[in-house]
């Protein structure tokens, strides 16, 4: 159990977990589903350039992009592109339809570039705790 691993009894451990959840350090408890096993084996990284950096356009794009079921992650980027999306679909054909029907119609899109992942080498969900200051966890 977690309590045994951290050297606490059950009740203090549970209280600590609750405090970490309430403070936002623990943001969710989830079961990770293997995308390939459920038929979503095509991963596409899409870079997006917008035609304007007007706050309204940015807000509209972000709202529409994060509402898309196919978009697993959306990052605001520095550098040559404005956003990076990680998209999952069943097939290249399905991605083509997503591109034509949804992505190109997102507000403010000037250019899209799609890169298909050939194979996943690492997809880690555990944080590198050795890099975290323990002072940050005093919640």
Name these PLM-found stretches.
Residues 1-139:
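A compositional/biophysical signature of low hydrophobicity enriched in polar/charged and small residues
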């Amino acid at each position: 159990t977690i309590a045994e691993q951290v050297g606490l009894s059950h009740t203090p451990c549970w209280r600590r977990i609750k405090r970490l959840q309430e403070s936002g350090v623990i943001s969710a408890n989830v079961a990770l589903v293997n995308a390939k096993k459920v038929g979503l084996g095509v991963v596409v990284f899409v870079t997006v350039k917008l035609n304007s950096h007007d706050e309204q356009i940015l807000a509209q794009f972000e709202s529409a992009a994060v509402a898309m079921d196919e978009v697993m992650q959306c990052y605001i980027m520095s550098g040559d592109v404005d956003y990076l999306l990680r998209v999952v679909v069943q097939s290249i054909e399905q991605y083509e339809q997503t591109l034509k029907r949804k992505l190109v119609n997102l507000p403010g899109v000037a250019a899209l570039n799609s890169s298909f992942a050939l194979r996943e080498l690492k997809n880690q969900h555990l944080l590198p705790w050795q890099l975290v200051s323990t002072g940050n966890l005093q919640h």
